[in-house]
A protein has these predicted regions:
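Short active-site segment of divalent metal-dependent hydrolases/proteases
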Residues: 122, 126-130
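Auxiliary, metal-adjacent structural segments of Zn-dependent hydrolase domains
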Residues: 33-103, 110-115, 161, 166-173
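Long, well-structured alpha-helical subdomains associated
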Residues: 162-193
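Post-HEXXH active-site segment of zinc metalloproteases
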Residues: 115, 119, 131-164
């Protein structure tokens, strides 16, 4: 059963976006559905059940709004964010960016856990932004004193880590726990047979 204090809004276009917001107050930060309704990006697809979490992030975190808006304003990239629960993966999340002729890019953000999703989404979206800015991770990973680390074919940046932590702090613990709880519930429903 849904939380009695929640109001859900579905917006359909080329993408389905579901945003849930507390219906008790009227501040922009407590009504992510209104923010998302005005700011749905055609080049960013957020898969079920992450839409309410992203809506909350957009309404509460100026840092995430900046990253999201930067990516949304680009015509040369398409981003997909999806939850793919997998306990056998050695990482919690991964972003794969592919480049095509003409400068087009496709970024696939996959979260393999329902833990710390606010932090992970922000962290991975910052990696997309880094790539759009032309960050050369391979070159930086071998530079002395660099904030980029290489692990086999994967890279990690201090900027991504710090952005994830900052957004999680801006969103706040209560909203993060609510998001994680709804994801666990949705995962149980979506993956139970």
């Amino acid at each position: 059963m849904a939380n009695p204090g929640m109001l859900c809004l579905a917006i359909s276009a080329a993408t389905l976006v579901t945003a849930c917001a507390a219906a008790r107050t009227t501040t922009p930060h407590s009504q992510p559905d209104r923010f998302v309704a005005r700011n749905v990006a055609s080049n960013i697809r957020v898969g079920f059940p992450l839409q309410p979490c992203v809506a909350t992030m957009l309404s509460r975190s100026p840092t995430f709004r900046e990253t999201y808006s930067t990516i949304a304003g680009r015509h040369d990239v398409r981003v997909t964010i999806e939850l793919v629960p997998n306990r056998t993966k050695p990482v919690r999340a991964v972003t794969e960016v592919r480049s095509f002729a003409g400068g087009q890019r496709v970024a696939a953000v996959r979260l393999y856990t329902t833990a710390d999703v606010i932090e992970l989404i922000a962290h991975e979206m910052e990696h997309v932004r880094e790539q759009l800015e032309g960050t050369n991770l391979l070159l930086l990973s071998v530079a002395r004193g660099s904030d980029v680390r290489r692990f086999g074919t994967k890279f990690e940046t201090r900027r991504g880590v710090e952005t994830g932590l900052r957004v999680a702090a801006e969103v706040g613990g209560t909203a993060s726990r609510t998001c994680q709880g709804s994801l666990r519930d949705a995962s149980l429903i979506a993956y139970s047979f």
